[in-house]
């Protein structure tokens, strides 16, 4: 067994296949066979995805605050476990369609921050469409819940899939399969939400440790321009179901705002002076967590008790979940196989739970973690991003007041600077409203047609020698005479 240890970092799936061929001779082999690649990774890399289980946690400091929810000693640790389990848990997956057609078919080893971004965004969508502090019921789900979950499936046509996030990262200078930092993840979320008409969320990323209230308001009241790039389906057509969000299309003045604040709270280790401020942050009703982790080991932080931060860990690899849309199409002989691009996000695809006479409930158990994990504050990487979600303008005003009166004064120096207006020394704030560069392919449809002279649309430049120019001048003189 020790002879295969050097292979651990290169190919976990081969190790798993090796063990599957062995008889169960001891407890460790049995555990590996049960947990698969995840346990092999845990045992051999010393970066266990589950460093502490619920049963081993001793909580001395109550109340616990999780994403703005207070859990008292009377509620007990079980209430916290249930709350953590109700959050979306997106982890490494394997065997999905190659990203970009020829790219990786698993995100194991590089996609942890992308998965944390998915978990954060999943929490935002739950609040947007269902409400705060969603409680998951393993026996029952709603259509809205399933629609949200579909948006994160590991498929190229799911809006918040690993495929879309990885490819959008290229616009931020990150090649596919390269590790993201918190700021890159925030920027990618800002760009992807532009295409989510259903949620209509604005994302503001505050840079340089400065939150300017005026800028956040501008972002929340801006809409993608009419000439912004539209989603292009694989057949080359613009998806007509997903037109731009313009003031003429949407009446409300305020778009629900996801506020992201990337920070670096120390050089190589997190500064102890910010502990109280982080504790206060998790008390804020608008808190939707922190994406950060350990160096090159991203985690999604959802709560805090004393110096312990509770988190969801994406470092657990599973096979790709079978698409419920594909399951339905295979069973329904009338289902079309045409590529519909992103339109299925607007027109809900029938899911198993909605066709109970034929199907059983969709198995979403792998998207919810049954264990509660924690890390000491001192072990957290100083590079992280705070996230807050304001459904209404009133919630945003309340958040600003809380930040100024409670959260920021809790540490000296404060975690970041809060300003009412943009300083004159900073360039003008330009809200991101999509890329204003839409090419109409029909303009090129007539190229090559028999009745089209391409040269007619261009100025023809002839190159003459000096002798030819002189001859032409003489000819002109003769003609004029």
From Swiss-Prot:
Which residues lie within the region annotated Disordered?
Answer: 462-481
The organism's place on the tree of life at top rank:
Eukaryota
Q: What is its EC number?
A: 3.4.22.-
Among the GO molecular function terms of this UniProt record, one is: protein-phosphatidylethanolamide deconjugating activity
Primary localization = cytoplasm
* Keyword Protease assigned: yes
Q: Which GO terms describe its cellular component?
A: cytoplasm
SUPFAM superfamilies cross-referenced by the UniProt entry: Cysteine proteinases
What this chain does, per the entry, is described as: Cysteine protease required for autophagy. Cleaves the C-terminal amino acid of ATG8 family proteins lgg-1, to reveal a C-terminal glycine. Exposure of the glycine at the C-terminus is essential for ATG8 proteins conjugation to phosphatidylethanolamine (PE) and insertion to membranes, which is necessary for autophagy. Its cleavage activity is functionally redundant to atg-4.2, but it cleaves lgg-1 precursors more efficiently than atg-4.2.
Q: Record's family? A: Belongs to the peptidase C54 family.
**UniProt cross-references to PANTHER family, sorted A to Z:** CYSTEINE PROTEASE, CYSTEINE PROTEASE ATG4
Question: What's the protein called, per UniProt?
Answer: Cysteine protease atg-4.1
């Amino acid at each position: 067994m020790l002879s295969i240890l050097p292979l651990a970092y290169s190919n976990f799936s081969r190790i798993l296949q090796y063990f599957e061929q062995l008889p169960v001779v001891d407890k460790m082999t049995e555990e590996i066979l049960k947990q698969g690649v995840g346990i092999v990774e845990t045992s051999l890399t010393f970066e266990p995805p589950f460093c502490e289980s619920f049963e081993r946690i001793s909580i001395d400091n109550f109340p616990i605050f999780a994403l703005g929810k207070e859990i008292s000693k009377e509620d007990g640790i079980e209430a916290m476990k249930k709350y953590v389990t109700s959050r979306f848990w997106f982890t490494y997956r394997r065997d999905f369609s190659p990203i970009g057609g020829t790219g990786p078919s698993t995100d194991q080893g590089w996609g942890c921050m992308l998965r944390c971004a998915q978990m954060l965004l999943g929490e935002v969508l739950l609040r947007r469409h269902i409400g705060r502090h969603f409680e998951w019921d393993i026996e029952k789900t709603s259509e809205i819940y399933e629609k949200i979950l579909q948006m994160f499936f590991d498929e190229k046509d799911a809006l918040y899939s690993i495929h879309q996030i990885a490819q959008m990262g290229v616009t931020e200078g990150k090649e596919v399969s390269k590790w993201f930092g918190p700021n890159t993840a925030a920027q990618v979320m800002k760009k992807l939400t532009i295409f989510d008409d259903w949620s209509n969320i604005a994302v503001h990323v505050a840079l340089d440790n400065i939150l300017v209230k005026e800028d956040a308001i501008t972002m929340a009241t801006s809409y993608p321009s009419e000439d912004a790039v539209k989603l292009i389906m694989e057949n080359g057509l613009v998806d007509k179901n997903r037109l731009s969000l313009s003031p003429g299309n949407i009446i409300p003045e305020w778009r629900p705002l996801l506020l992201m604040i990337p920070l670096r709270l120390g050089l190589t280790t997190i500064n102890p002076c910010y502990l109280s401020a982080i504790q206060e942050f998790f008390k804020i009703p608008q808190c939707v967590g922190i994406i950060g982790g350990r160096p090159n080991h991203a985690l999604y932080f959802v709560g805090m008790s004393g110096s312990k931060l509770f988190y969801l860990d994406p470092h657990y690899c599973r096979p790709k979940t079978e698409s419920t849309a594909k399951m339905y199409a295979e069973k329904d002989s009338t289902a079309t196989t045409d590529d519909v691009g992103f339109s299925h996000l607007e027109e809900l695809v029938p899911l198993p739970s909605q066709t109970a006479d034929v199907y059983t409930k969709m198995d979403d158990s792998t998207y919810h973690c049954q264990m509660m994990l924690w890390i000491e504050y001192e072990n957290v990487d100083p590079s992280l991003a705070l996230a807050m979600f304001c459904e209404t303008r009133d919630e945003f005003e309340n958040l600003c007041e809380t930040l100024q009166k409670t959260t920021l004064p809790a540490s000296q120096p404060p975690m970041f600077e809060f300003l009412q207006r943009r300083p004159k020394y900073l360039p003008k704030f330009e809200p991101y409203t999509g890329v204003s560069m839409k090419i109409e392919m029909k303009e090129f449809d007539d190229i090559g047609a028999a009745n089209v002279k391409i040269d007619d649309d261009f100025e023809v430049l002839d190159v003459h020698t000096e002798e030819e120019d002189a001859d032409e001048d003489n000819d002109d003189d003769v003609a004029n005479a």
